[in-house]
Amino acid sequence: MEAGIVSYGAYVPRYRITPTEIGRVWGVDGEAMGLGLNVRRKSVPAPDEDTITISTEALRTALVRGAIDPQQIGALYVGSESHPYAVKPTATVVAQAVGATPNLTAADFEFACKAGTAAIQTCLGLVGAGMVTYGVAIGTDTSQGAPGDALEYSASAGGAAFVIGKDRVICRVNRTVSYTTDTPDFWRREGQKYPSHGGRFTGEPAYFRHVTECAHRIMEAVGTTPKDYRHVVFHQPNGKFPQRVGKQLGFTEPQMRYGLVTPSIGNTYSAAALIGLANVLDHAGPGEKILVVGYGSGAGSDAFDLETTDAIDSYEKVYGRPVEYYLEKGVEISYAVYAKFRGKINMGGS
């Protein structure tokens, strides 16, 4: 495959809340909940942050790092399940904000937490076919769980943007494979504020089945085994699931080290695997093989066999903040501030 990753950027809001603080309000042992999920804290967007602003921040970093002219972007897709508008695309606002309009195609993608990886696949096809010079794929979410629900301990916010092209490729995409079924593990109807989920049903028949099947199929397709990869990144609805699936597939903790980011920032949904990949690329040198397996409820997985090139040595990683900054920093807030920021307090009226 000629097309690959030319540049990337990530952004995570600065505010954080811990499972302990959430549990304190609901009379639950939040510390035990956090340990069970392997989530120490999660990111919280400020009142003036949403999928549009987060996507724009991530993409601006990617464009400057790669010295890419926004007018050369021929396609821009934003994958999310928390688009600000039901009718009005996120992608057009982001494209306008970075100066990429008007000569491009743009659209919003939805497929739960794998909308971002689906956007990457689409960009790979367009670039590979010679229809566009650069394609931009963004995965961003400002996810929410109902007050007191188990999701509230992990659902967070963040985004990552990847520029796909043929020139100055820093990470080559060797193969991509998908595995998709109709599995109703997680859903939210139009007009419903918070999502519903199948509890334990979200595990074995949903996440684990799709991720393991997709991982096996891509390794079979390219003739690799777990030991051939320097890094592996899985979708991470919490910190526990990716560790478990990695062990089942035969990967080691060192291979998962940089790709596992949820324990520090929570589940960023469409951005989860992509922020993990961005962190891997922050630390990677030339010739390192990477396996990425995303997952989206409903349900499906997209897997990518990647390998960094010599160009990553000269790639301008210093612009913008590395993912590690977001994993280590943050301003902790109380549940009261969190509820205010996320609109969880119903003030009445329209």
Task: Kindly give the residue locations of the regions a language model identified.
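Conserved catalytic cysteine-centered active-site region
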Residues: D29-T53, E81-G135, R244-G276
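Short coil/turn connectors at secondary-structure junctions
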Residues: M1-A3, P70-G74, T101-L104, A129-G135, ...
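Acidic, glycine-rich active-site loops and adjacent beta-strand->loop/helix elements
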Residues: A10-Y11, G79-P84, F111-G116, G139-Q144, ...
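Flexible, glycine-rich active-site loops centered on histidine and acidic residues
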Residues: G128-A161
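Phosphate/pyrophosphate-binding loops at sites that engage ATP/ADP/AMP, CoA/4′-phosphopantetheine
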Residues: A58-G74, T212-D228, L249, A284
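Buried hydrophobic positions in well-ordered alpha/beta secondary-structure cores of metabolic enzymes
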Residues: I5-S7, M33, A62, L76, ...
